[in-house]
């Protein structure tokens, strides 16, 4: 059967405290005239019609942005990432779900798509995606976990980078530099 990624659900986690960045709504920071979250949603839209953002009531800009783009939003307590993740997955109640931070910038959509395709029909409950042996912050859930349940997981390594997590201002500045080099024709 030919692979189709249109049935995959993307869950974008946007309820963090933004401690290292100094801004709890870092996903709303501008990158190339669009927010980080807006860029991520624009990148994922060709891959799936099922994109949901999980956030908290403390993230008003994020909630309003999602409302303006008709992106379904799950409101969590924002106290514990694991609880927020579990609550969100249970609320969606559909697998497979690809979970990623709302502060992710996809740098190579074609390669990202091929990584997703390589996991098609995996029977492993969770697949954590690595880039050059470093966790990318992206995981595929093939099963909805029970509350507090620890699921078996597997790591899939991509030897080619396809995304960048924007965790600090330095990461944001590095991405802006990468994008300016790409625009100037110097990107390799």
Q: Where in this protein do the model-derived segments appear?
A:
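Conserved core of the sugar-phosphate nucleotidyltransferase
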Residues: 105-188
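Short acidic donor-binding/metal-coordinating loop in glycosyltransferase active sites
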Residues: 102
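Generic beta-sheet signal
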Residues: 8-10, 97-98, 127-129
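Conserved N-terminal catalytic core of the sugar/cofactor nucleotidyltransferase
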Residues: 2-3, 36-99, 110
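Hydrophobic packing residues within well-ordered alpha-helices of enzyme cores
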Residues: 21, 62-66, 115, 175
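Short, Lys/Arg-enriched, disordered terminal segments
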Residues: 1-7, 94, 179-188
């Amino acid at each position: 059967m030919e692979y189709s990624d249109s049935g995959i659900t993307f869950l974008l986690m946007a309820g963090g405290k933004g401690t290292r960045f100094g801004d709890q709504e870092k996903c709303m920071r501008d990158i190339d005239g669009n927010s980080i979250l807006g860029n991520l949603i624009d990148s994922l839209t060709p891959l799936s019609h099922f994109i949901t953002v999980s956030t908290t009531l403390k993230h008003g800009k994020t909630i309003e942005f999602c409302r303006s783009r008709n992106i379904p939003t799950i409101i969590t307590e924002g106290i514990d990432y694991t609880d927020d993740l579990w609550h969100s997955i249970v609320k969606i109640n559909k697998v497979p779900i690809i979970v990623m931070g709302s502060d992710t910038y996809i740098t190579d959509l074609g390669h990202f798509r091929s990584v997703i395709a390589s996991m098609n029909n995996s029977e492993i409950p969770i697949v954590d995606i690595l880039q050059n042996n470093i966790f990318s912050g992206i995981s595929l859930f093939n099963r909805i976990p029970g509350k507090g349940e620890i699921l078996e997981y597997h790591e899939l390594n991509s030897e080619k980078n396809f995304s960048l997590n924007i965790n600090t201002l330095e990461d944001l500045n590095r991405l802006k530099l990468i994008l300016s080099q790409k625009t100037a024709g110097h990107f390799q």
